[in-house]
Design a protein with these regions (language model features):
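Sec/Tat signal peptide C-region and signal peptidase I cleavage site
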Residues: 23-27
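Short aromatic/basic micro-patch
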Residues: 5, 130, 168
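Gly/Pro-biased beta-strand-loop elements
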Residues: 32-147
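N-terminal targeting pre-sequences for secretion and organelle import
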Residues: 167-190
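Short, basic/aromatic beta-hairpin or loop at an interaction surface
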Residues: 157-165
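Short Gly/Pro-enriched loop/turn and capping motifs at secondary-structure junctions
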Residues: 141-143, 154-156, 174
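N-terminal secretory signal peptides and thylakoid transit peptides that target proteins
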Residues: 1-18
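Histidine-centered active-site/metal-ligand motif
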Residues: 150
Length: 190
């Protein structure tokens, strides 16, 4: 028997819970190790607030919020020889970005990316897109480097050096970072 106390609020709450259930179940399948979860940490005085610092060997990204204070996130980084190093700026930010492999990726891995050769096809944004929920585009001197800080469909890659060069984050973590970081932010990858 259906209760007459079934209000609009109850309907909305029940519907929202139902929509989130698949995401919740998916998130429960893999728990990121504790050290790679976002946490506030102290950083050196020499690191200016308002910038991103990425330490690929330790698989951490730091958003420096204030003097001596940063949010540290675990990341996945590029395989040896494919990683980005140096300084860039975030010139573009996108929610649920489209994706296509770079020409170098197509050449390096034709078995995986051959269907993209000789065309401009791109995968639309969405839950199965390798760039995940958000992407921050790295530029040098106004030119796209084709390196990104982005979400991932492979959360187990966090803490590993397995990508084609980009910096991968858990989708909820990159969404949090996306909201904090403005266009023009300096990114240093050591």
């Amino acid at each position: 028997m259906i209760s007459r106390n079934f209000s609009r609020r109850t309907f909305i709450q029940t519907s929202a819970a139902g929509m989130l259930l698949p995401q919740f179940a998916s998130a429960q399948e893999y728990q990121v190790p504790e050290q790679f979860k976002p946490q506030y940490v102290r950083v050196k005085d020499s690191i200016a607030p308002g910038q991103l610092l990425i330490l690929p060997r330790s698989h951490f990204l730091y958003w420096v919020e204030a003097k001596n204070k940063a949010v540290r996130y675990g990341v996945g980084v590029g395989k040896a020889g494919l990683e980005f190093t140096g300084t860039a700026t975030i010139d573009v930010k996108k929610e649920w970005p489209t994706w296509r492999p770079t020409d170098d990726m197509i050449e390096r891995e034709p078995k995986n990316y051959g269907k993209y050769k000789g065309n401009l096809d791109a995968m639309p944004g969405g839950p199965s897109n390798p760039l995940g929920a958000r992407a921050l585009y790295l530029f040098q001197n106004g030119k796209d480097t084709y390196f990104r800080i982005h979400g991932t469909t492979q959360p187990k890659s966090i803490g590993r050096s397995v990508s084609n060069g980009c910096i991968r984050m858990i989708n909820s973590h990159v969404t949090d970072l996306y909201e904090r970081v403005p266009i023009g932010t300096t990114v240093t990858v050591l």
